[in-house]
């Protein structure tokens, strides 16, 4: 067994919380192992004045960590699963997916209790095309502005009065101790979450069998099956930050149910469908749902966007 592990992590408070959480679990499981963190800046962290959809490319928050993995500078990388591309670089693998926290989006406001109580023309901040499209579908009167930066920065912009409300991932707020800022967990029939939202992903080198074996205990099989379905759907659609796609899968015993949306940028068209089947076939079901939705009009929506 390896007696020294180096975890690669982004430098944001949320990323450090997540990586320290994994480090603590590893130390508890392997008391004789020394676990340290190596902070790495990613492209997504450096470019904060441009909407994610306009930066383009995949792996905005993962590529530099993956380079460090491949070059042997770190033994594993901790990511928010929603940030991970569906296709990984050759030589790397998704070793474990942790038990999912709340996968939903959180409505945060100092004035209003829910999206439904926002006044006409209210200003709402979010960095996600997925959220924007779904929110505009329900509330086309809202003025949605781009919101970048870490969680603290986004909350500060709200508190400074720059907007009436913001939308953030519920899991991130909870992990950083901001549960009291959540006014509402947005229902999935209003806004489906991003692929993998709420789960942490552990990535390492494929040939590092020793480290992979040490990380097995971190994997939560129900979460892994559900997110495999979501990632298979996304991979088939070939969508990233540039496409408004929401998908959420839930395992119940040996079954999995998947719900997904493909939307136009302005929310004027939202295609929604579901599928259910055996959890062992989760990835295949995700692809099946993706193909079905492409044939039902999703392909036309994507053609307009791309």
Set out the residue ranges of the language-model regions.
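Structured loop/turn residues at beta-strand edges in well-structured enzyme cores
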Residues: 72, 120, 161
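Small-molecule-sensing regulatory modules
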Residues: 2-48, 54, 62, 137-306
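Short, structured active-site "lid" loops
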Residues: 50-75
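A conserved helix-loop-strand patch within extracytoplasmic ligand-binding domains
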Residues: 81-82, 90-142
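Short, Asp-centered acidic motifs that coordinate Mg2+ and/or phosphate
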Residues: 74-78, 164-165
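Short glycine-rich anion-binding loops that position phosphate/pyrophosphate groups of nucleotides
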Residues: 81-84, 171-173
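Extracytoplasmic loops/domains of multi-pass membrane proteins
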Residues: 68, 84-89
């Amino acid at each position: 067994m390896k007696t020294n592990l180096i975890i690669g992590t982004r430098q944001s408070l949320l990323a450090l919380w997540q990586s320290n959480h994994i480090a603590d679990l590893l130390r508890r499981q392997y008391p004789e192992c020394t676990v340290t963190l190596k902070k790495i800046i990613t492209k997504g962290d450096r470019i904060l004045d441009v909407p994610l959809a306009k930066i383009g490319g995949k792996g905005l928050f993962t590529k530099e960590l993956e380079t460090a993995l491949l070059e042997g500078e770190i033994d594993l990388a901790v990511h928010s699963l929603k940030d991970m591309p569906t296709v990984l670089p050759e030589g790397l693998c998704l070793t474990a997916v942790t038990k999912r926290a709340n996968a939903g989006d959180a409505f945060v406001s100092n004035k209003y209790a829910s999206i439904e109580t926002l006044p006409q023309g209210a200003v709402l901040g979010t960095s996600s095309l997925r959220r924007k499209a779904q929110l505009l579908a329900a509330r086309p009167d809202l003025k949605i502005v781009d919101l970048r930066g870490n969680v603290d920065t986004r909350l500060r912009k709200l508190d400074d009065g720059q907007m009436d409300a913001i939308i953030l991932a519920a899991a991130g707020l909870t992990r950083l101790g901001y549960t009291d800022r959540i006014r509402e967990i947005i229902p999935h029939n209003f806004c489906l979450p991003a692929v993998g939202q709420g789960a942490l992903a552990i990535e390492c080198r494929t040939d590092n069998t020793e480290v992979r074996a040490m990380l097995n205990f971190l994997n939560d099989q129900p979460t892994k099956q559900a997110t495999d379905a979501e990632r298979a759907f996304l991979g088939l659609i070939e969508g990233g930050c540039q496409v408004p796609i929401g998908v959420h899968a839930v395992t119940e015993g040996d079954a999995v149910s998947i719900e997904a949306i493909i939307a136009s940028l302005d929310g004027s068209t939202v295609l929604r469908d579901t599928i259910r089947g055996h959890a062992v076939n989760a990835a295949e079901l995700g692809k099946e749902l993706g193909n079905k939705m492409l044939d039902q009009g999703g392909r036309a929506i994507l053609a307009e966007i791309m």
